Amino acid sequence: MVIDASVVLAWLQDAPGSDMAERHMVEGVIGAANWSEVLQKARQHGAQPGLVARLLTSFGLQVVDVTAEDGERAADLWAAGSVLSLADRLCLALGLRLGLAVVTTDHAWRSIAHGPEVIVAR
């Protein structure tokens, strides 16, 4: 399963969906762009990114590099007026490349055409 940054952040903040997040982090993957987003938010809220990184990887969460193919698919997922950020589209593109479902807390992802299976954690 590909884990969106929103799911990891929900777990770190013990927000709704955090129980589901922990289950998926055990064998999940997160793209490098979303990994950066998680660590940036940790820093923004006063946490030590290195400590957060070690905690998350101790669950078995694997960080996967973004590829040129992911970049091309993310561009294909763009649509005028879309609420999807570049990091969102890269997460979806990673799911497509790996043939895995993507878990997020963002309900808007369910309406993405030509994307991977989306599971909403809340």
Please describe what each predicted stretch is.
Residues 25-26, 60, 99:
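Residue-level detector of structured alpha->beta connecting loops
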Residues 57-81:
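Acidic catalytic patch
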Residues 92, 96-122:
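Acidic, PIN/NYN-like endoribonuclease modules and their adjacent C-terminal/linker elements
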Residues 1-30, 42-54, 122:
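Short, well-structured N-terminal submotif of metal-dependent ribonuclease cores
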Residues 3-4, 30-33, 84-86, 106-107, ...:
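Histidine- and aromatic-rich ligand-binding microenvironments
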Residues 7-8, 34, 70, 90-91, ...:
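Alpha-helix capping/helix-boundary segments
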